[in-house]
Amino acid sequence: MKLNKKKIKIISVVGTRPEIIRLSRIFSVLDKYCEHVLVHTGQNYDYELNQIFFDDLKIRKPDFFLNISKNSKSVANTIGNLITAVDELFDKVQPDAILVLGDTNSCLSVIPAKRRKIPIFHMEAGNRCFDQRVPEEINRKIIDHVADIHLPYSSIAREYLLKEGINADQIIKIGSPMFEVLNYYLPKIKKSKITSKLKLKKNNYFVVSVHREENIDSNVNFNKIVQIINMVAENYKLPVIISTHPRTQKKLNLQKIKFHSKVNFIKPLGFCDYVNLQMHAKTVLSDSGTITEESSILNFPALNIRETHERPEGMEEGAVMMVGLEVTRVFKGLDILKNQSKEKKRMINIVEDYNVPNVSEKVLRIIHSYIDYVNRLVWKKFS
């Protein structure tokens, strides 16, 4: 009998910064052990938002760029472009499996994959904020109930999947990939000169990051965020550094808003510069999903300025404080965090499900182990 040495052909689909960052180490092992086809959908594509991260993290050029957002007039239009483009790509590439991470529109590429009976592996499965106003919450439920193998980060996310009727044998908890990513790039992060470049004194400035649709597109929420930013600058008399996402910049361009003189807007930074900036800030105020993991792993004080969130495991350790969009809650949070030590002796333990050094190897082995399982048990394909 002749041994089949053909590598598994896996297609991974990304379209935003968080996906690129979280999958950076996984791309490396897939390139080594599989026939890996890397696809960028073009969901968010310009140098600041994407290419700078490919360069910074030394990720190879994608095999395909789909440009789904070009001339798109609506979210529905973008999603339609995605499904059509990805389906045509599947016909060309003929992958053995697809890997997606998270809850972006790009992850909806699982829909044509399902129709073509391609085994689907979903990282970050099971995250729930239980708020239908959050567009990602809708995507999460669609992706989770289409995917074949679910790879949640936490035990809580695993329980959510079970309660929604997902079979236990199709759920494998892997932990967050961010510990592996941050530790791999930590030497480069520490070498960053971003604080001196921006003329900032360590622990004497704030970092603010806001980009979520429910915060920016709502005038009520956006005005609350503006008030928070100005009040922090006014009361602390310290620089407030804001890395501007295109959605945020677009909103700022439409409205003539007066900001405090201590508020500084900068273009989006590369991964290593931005993480360094967060590590040396007095406090980070953010509506990002990643802030819970980053603040827990790297031990810096952070406030989550959202009304809902999807990482309760972070709250169990107090890794980040949820303060919503009310000024009084923000300032109470800042007062509590002012004594948080950044030294090696932690005040707050790292979240257990984030303290995982080998997620990339886990994912590689799970994909190799479960492609045949999906083909046999889901699609009844018998060789």
Q: Where do the PLM segments sit?
A:
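N-terminal glycine-rich anion-binding loop in soluble enzyme alpha/beta folds
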Residues: 32-62, 68
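A donor-sugar binding/catalytic signature common to diverse glycosyltransferases
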Residues: 100-101, 107-110, 122-123, 150, ...
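A nucleotide-sugar donor-handling region in carbohydrate enzymes
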Residues: 43-48, 69, 146-221, 323
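Short alpha-helical donor nucleotide-sugar binding micro-motif in glycosyltransferases
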Residues: 86, 90, 276-281
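Donor-nucleotide binding loops and adjacent catalytic segments primarily
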Residues: 43-46, 51, 190-280, 381
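Active-site and donor-binding regions of nucleotide-sugar-utilizing enzymes
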Residues: 8-14, 19-29, 33, 53, ...
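C-terminal amphipathic helix plus adjacent low-complexity
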Residues: 339-383
